[in-house]
Amino acid sequence: MGVVSAYRKKAVSRIIRPFRTANRYQKMHNDISQTVRRDLLAANGLSPEDLSRSLSAIGTHHVDYADIYCQRTAFESWHLEEGMVKSGSFQIDQGVGVRAVSGEKTAFAYADSLNADSIRRSAETVRVIGAAGREAHIRTPSEKYGKAVHQTANPIHSLDSAAKVALLHRVEELAKAADPRIVQVMAGLTCEYDLIYIARLDGRHAADIRPLVRLSITVIAKQGERREMGSAGGGGRFDLSYFSDKLVTEYVNAAVQQALTNLEARPAPAGLMKVVLGSGWPGVLLHEAVGHGLEGDFNRKQTSAFSGKIGQRVAAKGVTVVDQGDIADRRGSLNIDDEGNETSRTVLIEDGILVGYMQDETNARLMGMQSTGNGRRESYASAPMPRMTNTFMENGGHDPEEIIASLDKGIYAVNFGGGQVDITSGKFVFSASEAWWVENGKLQYPVKGATIVGNGPEVLKHVSMIGNDSALDKGVGVCGKDGQSVPVGVGQPTLRIDAGLTVGGSEA
């Protein structure tokens, strides 16, 4: 498991779902449906009725569930390094994934050609998971309305190539002007535009359009013989007009400040100690060490530390953890999940009590629960599974300054790089990309080489102070699970953890 690319922070406080007016909501849904039917289905000689007929062929066998997932993705990327654009690429991929489920067994087939023949052959392949002998029924398609939680414009067309390159050069210009110690700048810009159409055996059909943009910045600072790195960036479900000069300057300043701070960093101390985690991106630790363990498949298989603990205390009082896929424009947000269900706000832990899991259709059915709109897949070539969207801890009642001031000795981890977690045990290790030594309630000096080691479920029980500054990351997170990567959001307020964490460093 892993989330990569990280930066902070957009205040969320208590996150409210964004609903448009009824008329705008209806128009947006109609626009999505018409665009997807025209540019994805009709462009490949298909109609919703064609998909229903293929599903009816699957339905002649004894299966519990089946779906067809059609997708067309356009992807563009640009990368600047050493003052020049080193690479630029544009790709279009389309195809179909067909799935049938019988009990705990799943049959899945996909094709990178989208036409009636590839769908028919895929349907014939997967239906053998169930015994033949049912009467065929062609259900009239009934389209499910998704939530209008983000715009639908194609970001690839929102700027021409010259303007995209100019944006990357602007990043370099700002970074080198910020401080003479910045000696190298790397910047990447990616745009994605997905068209999705889902047809299910129960007659439900759903369409979605998913834009996604990301700007990533890395700088190298040099002082004497010492070189240090700083990173920042952001994005979401926007077009490229989102990256205003003001926002780009903010990203650049964050990357530069991190690099310059690390130039002054001393070796991190090592040992058991109290830790304060900053708001925003440090929620990646919550995502990895706790969030994956709250996904339905791990709990159905009894491989999670949270298996069978609904209704039990699993965290300190005040700890409330939520997964919410319908926050406006966020990287992890979706109008519908990849099984055609609306995304939603799912409370997982409430005031320290485990109250629910994230579910897709299959695991929800097998556990006697309802889907929470968390069925996600990387592409048409992958079967869906329960996945996080935007996962965060809600606010507490303490000012972040008060939390730091309460720490006699310990580490304040402002930002994280990579990490690893074992879902079954909950054990994790994360590397801090920016951290400070705190003594007598004051920041003393930055430290380098700090790794945070602990057990996710145990750490939750030792949260002693929760800040009132809950924030989501800036919008560049990518989560990996079972070989599939999907965009996600993470977040939390400032937290003080009094036990259960070991800091690994070079200074004992």
Where does each model-flagged region fall?
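N-terminal small-residue-enriched
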Residues: 6-508
